[in-house]
């Protein structure tokens, strides 16, 4: 079974990568992955904003039939009984991980990625959280992981993980850069699964 690494980047246009003709910006690592792997040349975003677009990708449902219809603070998420790309691959013997931005609605618990097929999750739980590269916390498999970063005082109310816009803010103390933590976690997941097929999203 082939390993699958699916990179979903918000606001990344078709022509932004070298492998699709970009001449000014250099994207050598992504270009190499595309050359060694598979390129999709006829694909549309499920929606114009991130949460429903991610829901459509993961569930395979048309935008009109997914429960996540927009970016909202309401606790609307993919339900645990809903089939997802991760749950199907998990059932086929894959080790599955979501590392980075979950951003599929606003869960009222932090196990939503794990509940819908991911063995492992480490990252931002919602879109507001993901707007800060130096958050005060991240989520790992349903648990809050405190970081050494600190947001400005005006954003302190949003650092309660149970707040609907949890994680929102601008850091004034910047010690741990979240994308670096995601890279480290991704590499560890790949190393741990050398002998198993894996799906890394």
Predicted segment positions?
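Formylglycine-dependent sulfatase
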Residues: 1-201
